[in-house]
Curated annotation (Swiss-Prot):
This is Protein ApaG. The lineage of its organism: Bacteria, Pseudomonadati, Bdellovibrionota, Bdellovibrionia, Bdellovibrionales. It comes from Bdellovibrio bacteriovorus (strain ATCC 15356 / DSM 50701 / NCIMB 9529 / HD100). NCBIfam families: PRK05461.1 (NF003967). InterPro entries: ApaG-like, ApaG_domain, ApaG_sf, Uncharacterised_ApaG. PANTHER family: OS05G0170800 PROTEIN (PTHR47191:SF2).
Length: 127
């Protein structure tokens, strides 16, 4: 009997509002975020592409698809963490992002991992 190893990943996001890059009076809010991807499984896998759905406070959705992340297609070994920084402008002071990363495992199998929804909230939106 052959045992199959299913890759397992934990993904977290940290968001920061960037006031120096934002122009709230003009409807431009700039958010920076750091994504941490940890391979908690027992097999390596390579991140091949991404798909994001970005939603603003008015319900307007924008989809972003592309190869890798920040120009890279990292191979993430078991126990290894890969982090990257990116950014997202919005026309509203709040919004959210949710997505999916598409990987290829060491045996050539393709699979995807959901990026849990995270929120983009300008400090001024809380007052």
């Amino acid at each position: 009997m052959q045992k199959t190893s299913i890759p397992d990943f934990q993904i977290t996001a940290k968001v920061v509002y960037v006031p120096s890059e934002s122009r709230p009076d003009e409807g431009y809010h700039f958010f920076a975020y750091k994504i941490t991807i940890t391979n908690t499984g027992s097999t390596p896998a390579q991140l091949m592409s991404r798909h994001w759905v970005i939603t603003d406070a008015l319900g307007k959705k924008e989809e972003v698809r592309g190869p890798g992340v920040v120009g890279l297609q990292p191979k993430i070994q078991p126990g290894q963490t890969f982090e990257y920084d990116s950014a997202c402008p919005l026309t509203t002071s709040t919004g959210s992002m949710v997505g999916r990363y598409f990987f290829v495992g060491e045996s050539g199998e393709s699979f995807s991992v959901e990026v849990p929804e995270f929120y983009l909230i300008a400090p001024l939106a809380l007052h």
